Amino acid sequence: MGMGKDIFEITVNGLKLVVIFLMMVQAVPILVWLERRGSAFIQDRLGPNRVGPLGLVQLLADAVKFLNKENFMPQTAKPFLYYAAPIFALIPGAVAFSAIPLSSPIQVGTFEMFGSTWGPYTFLVQGYDIGVGIVFILGVSSLAAYTLLMAGWGSGNKYTLMGALRASAQTISYELALGLSIVGVIMLYGTFNLTEMTLAQQGPLAFSFLGHTITANWLPNWGIFYQPVGALLFFSAAFAESNRLPFDLAEGESELVGGFHTEYGGFKFNMFFIGEYGHMMIASGLMVLFFFGGYTIPYVSVAELNEWAAGVASTAGKASALVALIHFLVFNIKFGFFMWVFIWVRWTLPRFRYDQLMDLGWKTMLPWALANTIITAFVIYIASL
């Protein structure tokens, strides 16, 4: 029985990974459409509006175009690196996003399957729950720098190599500020576990300082009210990590040469594009999780929502599923807002020069992140006296 349950859990976790990856890939065309319509709205034009209602079928036309383009490889390219780079571009985003809790767990009661009794079972609405979720996500996301170098070196083109070196230097530079910006959050909540961080942000704002409990019922208990500087630094560094404007020095979409993926076209280019949106999704998901309560509803604790659902649903399993559905919708509303901010900023701010980009990362954001970490540690120590 124990072996069967282990196989069952491995199968369920494998299926969840596949489903989350498919959700990410399927979300990309919708985000592309939203970006096109959003940029048109910002620039006072129409955007895609000819193919289908509101231009929605344009997504299918683009997919067919990418799949039917000629597959070629430059003579000077290194075949393994050239073909492996777009594949590996998808992996960090999908694997890292799978570790983010998208909703509260669903409690499944006992049930019969394959002639055996199974359960009770706690179904996590995430690919996998590991105790050091933050470290895992940052570690996997950082592998994207290798993808850039693989594409630049494997293309056998000096311009793609220079673009890859610039892009990887940018990514590595801002990873320092990105990592330090959330050290304050880790110290504040005292855990690396993402679910525990989410649950720590339930209800209205309340904290203890020098033996006194301070409450503000008109504010949600979100991390941004404890770490406003960390939130600003994290979100700014996330733009640089995902190579989005105003930090798109890796490619420069308005220029003739596309940086590290100059020699890629068709579906191979599209895979890099999906990878970029994957990093945007990770950044938006982590922003929601660290600083905006994750899947929790503002002012409402999980226990209060469970109590309400128990009075509405006929069984405990249905009540748990209802709570998970509500939390999933809440997470996606917050998540969608930050995805829109990525689009909004791209079509609003101009691009930095490369020297400005490096100065901002090393001379401004890194010192501020260090100062925020030191001050947070000092305040937590004083509050504990």
Swiss-Prot record:
Gene Ontology MF terms: NADH dehydrogenase activity; oxidoreductase activity, acting on NAD(P)H, quinone or similar compound as acceptor; quinone binding
UniProt main location, coarse: membrane
Positions of transmembrane segments: 14-34, 80-100, 130-150, 172-192, 219-239, 280-300, 325-345, 365-385
Sections of the chain in a coiled coil: none
Membrane topology field: Multi-pass membrane protein
Reactions performed catalytically: a quinone + NADH + 5 H(+)(in) = a quinol + NAD(+) + 4 H(+)(out)
Enzyme class: translocase
Keyword entries, A-Z: Cell inner membrane, Cell membrane, Membrane, NAD, Quinone, Translocase, Transmembrane, Transmembrane helix, Ubiquinone
Similarity comment: family membership: Belongs to the complex I subunit 1 family.
Self-association and partners: NDH-1 is composed of 14 different subunits. Subunits NuoA, H, J, K, L, M, N constitute the membrane sector of the complex.
Full protein name: NADH-quinone oxidoreductase subunit H
Organism expressing this protein natively: Bdellovibrio bacteriovorus (strain ATCC 15356 / DSM 50701 / NCIMB 9529 / HD100)
